[in-house]
Amino acid sequence: MVGLLAGCVSPIALNRAVIAYDDAVTDALSQQLLINIARAYHRQPIHFTGVSNIAATFSFQANAGAMPSPGGLAGASIMPIFGGTFAENPTISIVPIEGEDFTQRLLTPFPQNKLTLLLRQRYDVDLLLRMMAQEVRLFQSPHYEIYRNSPRDTANYEMFRRVVLHLSAIQDDNKLYAEPLPLIHTWTIPARAIEAEGFQALQKEFSVRHDPISNTYTLRKHTAGPILITNYDPALLSDEERDQLNDMADDWDVSDIAFDIRADHYGGAWPMRGVFRLRSFHSILGFLGKAIGADAGYHVDKDVRTPPILNDENPDLTMELEISRIPPSEADISVRWNDRFYAVKTTGPYARWNRDAFQLLFLLFQMTVTDIPRVGVPSITIAK
């Protein structure tokens, strides 16, 4: 019976401890994100601290005994007594997240593949680009016009918002593609230049065709080009169209993500071609911090050529925060910093949007941070 008691208690206690520690670490990071948005607003340094290790020791002790029943010995019966103790001794190591490697990742704009990864998780392209893109460059032959994602610059900001709303409307109808541009590279070489061993190696990487008239081999290889957001399947493009788009990509940065909206497909009433330039995580925190003050977003109507937007979802702010002197009563999570409470607004018509925005911010931080070192750095160890 004693063994059974200990066996039942220990897994339950362990499960509760694992969940409690997981909640505590998640809440700590969420609060740090809110604090750093506030720091960005007040132009204070951005800084993060992480939990590098949690080591918890559990001890379970059970005992048993017996005593006479309340009727005394005359009753000839014995009352069993079972007891036990449970002790938890956690050791938590806390380390600052800093150093040149992390700083470079913090300041480096996100590459295009990060945005497409999130798009495939069904995040709203409007939310993604409002948070992650610093500007859109619309191609207006023979050059690009730049429109910055900054509410302070009214004309630029409103064009930026209209472009991302247009893409969002196409996404709402499941007509938005975000795929690598499929490319085919071709080479022609004389047959005499290839030896038998080399020919076998070529066949593993290329499709090979021999032309007996010219005695040459034509080598073809399929490769993935730059990622392109479109309102059509890029696999249906002709080789000439793919090469043309790929030539344009020579001027793009790794943090640029191009789009090509064509007239003969859904959303084609406003054909456009251009590039979004993505931000770094540090810039995202700065953007959200500025939104607390005078550089807040505001309502922008979609373009008249834009198809209907699902549920007319078009919030003024990328992520709305509540700031107060008292703890917010209905917030999912809040943090106190400099005598103010900061929380993501999770009430009202855009509660889901704001939760998605904060979840996106959390994921972007995870994409930015390196593995937290476990040894060899200054740390704080808390032993209970």
Predicted regions and their residues:
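N-terminal amphipathic/basic membrane-interacting segments and domains
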Residues: V9-K384
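C-terminal motif of bacterial Sec signal peptides marking the signal peptidase cleavage site
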Residues: L4-G7
